[in-house]
Structure formats: structure tokens, C-alpha cells
């Protein structure tokens, strides 16, 4: 089970939001690259970046901070980024800068043809981010709820050739209420590509619950507020997850 620290970027700083509300941002560090180094030193094997300003503006807004993070740790572990990615030129630029994965969310839902083009042009580097509430997909920084069922879109995008799917339960994100295991497993069973869980991770119990269903196709989990607030010790959690996997394999 891959534990992936999230670095959410707003106005060049590392922040956390509650339920995607830009007005409820807590600043955790003014230098995101320093935060990235911290998580790598604590044992992170991948980083998850979100350009929050970009997600709402529909175009990149924190490129300097993103490049600084890539320069700091991109040569050591894969870095993935979502938020404000709406065209192939932006994807190409980010991949050239050293990103390993680009996450397409709203643009994939609103313009599936763009996602197909991206998967065709940059195979192996495109992740789809599906954000949902009560099984329905949300777009535009979670501000708009669509009528699309998560599983239906996931299967469609899998056929396009995306690398994996990040599934975020909007109702739980930033609330430390626990991962929605049932909904995550349901989605993982609907597709053959890996699913990464997101939204609500709160403690070791969540990690253990995810490890129990890892073989359903759940590759990892995004770690947000819990590792910043101290509710979850990231290094200890990743070590614990690795040990659980080793015991299962024994």
C-alpha cells in the first residue's frame, strides 16, 4: 500500500482545505519544496501535488512552486500533479519539467475527447481524478455536482488508456472522518486499472482497513490533513502498511 503525501498549493504556499473550500485554508508551510523534502525524508515513495488556484481558474497558477518541488525531489521519487490541466501543451510542459504523472479531473468529465488525446499522446503518464459525493461525480473544484455515476465514467476512461484513477470522497476530504472503504472498493472492482483512495484518511485504522482490501486493486492512498495535524505519523504508517503486506505475502 502506497501512502502518498499531498501537498496542496495555494498562492505559492502549502495549505490544506476543508471539503474543498478555498476560504477554509490552513497554511502549513510557506515553502512547498521544503515540505516535499520533509515527506521524502520520512519515507514517501510518491508525492501528490494539487494546484488549488489552478483547479478553480482552469489554468496553471502555482508553476514556480511546482518546479521547485520537482527540482528538490523529482529525481528521487515520482511526483504527480492535478489542478488546472486543460490542454496538451500544459501536460507536455509539466512532463518535460520532470513530473511523472499528470492528473486530469474536470477536463476529463467535461471533455472526454481531451482525455483520450492525452492518453494517446502521453501513455503511462495520465491519471484520472474522479471526485464524488454519494456516487455522483463533481467538477470545477468540487463546486458542481454532475449526474454521472463514478463507476460508469471510470470504465469509460479505463478504455481510453489512463494509468490509474484517484477516487476522492468529497464529503470526507479534510474532515478526518475516515476513508470511505466501501465506495472505494466498489470502484476498484468496476475497473482493472489501479485505484488510489483519497478523502478522509484519519488514523492507522484506515490504513489497516485499506491494506485488507488492497488486493481488490487499491494501489495507495492520498494522505492529507491527518499527517499535517499530527493525527497520523506518516513514517510509522508507511512502515506499518509495508509490514502488513509482508505478513500477507508470507
From Swiss-Prot:
BP terms from Gene Ontology: L-histidine biosynthetic process; L-tryptophan biosynthetic process
Keyword Isomerase belongs to the record: yes
Reactions catalysed, as given in the entry: 1-(5-phospho-beta-D-ribosyl)-5-[(5-phospho-beta-D-ribosylamino)methylideneamino]imidazole-4-carboxamide = 5-[(5-phospho-1-deoxy-D-ribulos-1-ylimino)methylamino]-1-(5-phospho-beta-D-ribosyl)imidazole-4-carboxamide
Primary location group: cytoplasm
GO cellular component term of the entry, any: cytoplasm
Cellular localization per UniProt: Cytoplasm
Keyword tags: Amino-acid biosynthesis, Cytoplasm, Histidine biosynthesis, Isomerase
GO MF terms, alphabetically ordered: 1-(5-phosphoribosyl)-5-[(5-phosphoribosylamino)methylideneamino]imidazole-4-carboxamide isomerase activity
Gene3D superfamilies per UniProt: Aldolase class I
Active site: 8 (proton acceptor), 131 (proton donor)
Superkingdom as given in the UniProt entry: Bacteria
Family from the record: Belongs to the HisA/HisF family.
Protein name: 1-(5-phosphoribosyl)-5-[(5-phosphoribosylamino)methylideneamino] imidazole-4-carboxamide isomerase
Organism annotation: Paraburkholderia phymatum (strain DSM 17167 / CIP 108236 / LMG 21445 / STM815) (Burkholderia phymatum)
Amino acid at each position: 500500500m502506497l501512502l502518498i503525501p499531498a501537498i496542496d498549493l495555494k498562492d505559492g504556499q502549502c495549505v490544506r482545505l476543508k471539503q474543498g473550500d478555498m476560504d477554509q485554508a490552513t497554511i502549513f508551510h510557506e515553502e512547498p519544496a521544503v515540505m516535499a523534502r520533509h515527506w521524502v525524508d520520512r519515507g514517501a515513495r510518491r508525492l501528490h501535488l494539487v494546484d488549488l488556484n489552478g483547479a478553480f481558474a482552469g489554468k496553471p497558477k502555482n508553476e514556480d512552486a511546482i518546479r521547485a518541488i520537482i527540482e528538490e525531489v523529482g529525481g528521487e521519487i515520482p511526483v504527480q500533479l492535478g489542478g488546472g490541466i486543460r490542454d496538451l501543451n500544459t501536460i507536455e510542459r509539466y512532463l518535460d519539467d520532470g513530473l511523472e504523472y499528470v492528473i486530469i479531473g474536470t477536463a476529463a468529465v467535461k471533455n472526454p475527447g481531451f482525455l483520450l488525446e492525452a492518453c494517446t499522446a502521453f501513455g503511462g503518464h495520465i491519471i484520472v481524478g474522479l471526485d464524488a459525493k454519494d456516487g455522483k461525480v463533481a467538477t470545477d473544484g468540487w463546486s458542481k455536482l454532475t449526474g454521472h455515476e463514478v463507476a460508469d465514467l471510470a470504465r469509460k476512461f479505463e478504455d481510453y488508456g489512463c494509468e490509474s484513477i484517484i477516487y476522492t470522497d468529497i464529503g470526507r476530504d479534510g474532515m478526518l472522518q475516515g476513508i470511505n472503504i466501501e465506495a472505494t472498493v466498489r470502484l476498484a472492482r468496476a475497473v482493472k486499472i489501479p485505484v488510489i483512495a483519497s478523502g478522509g484518511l484519519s488514523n492507522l485504522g484506515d490504513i489497516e482497513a485499506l491494506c485488507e482490501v488492497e488486493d481488490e486493486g487499491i494501489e495507495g492512498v492520498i494522505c492529507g490533513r491527518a499527517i499535517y495535524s499530527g493525527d497520523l505519523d506518516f513514517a510509522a504508517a508507511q512502515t506499518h502498511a509495508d509490514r502488513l503486506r509482508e505478513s500477507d505475502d508470507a
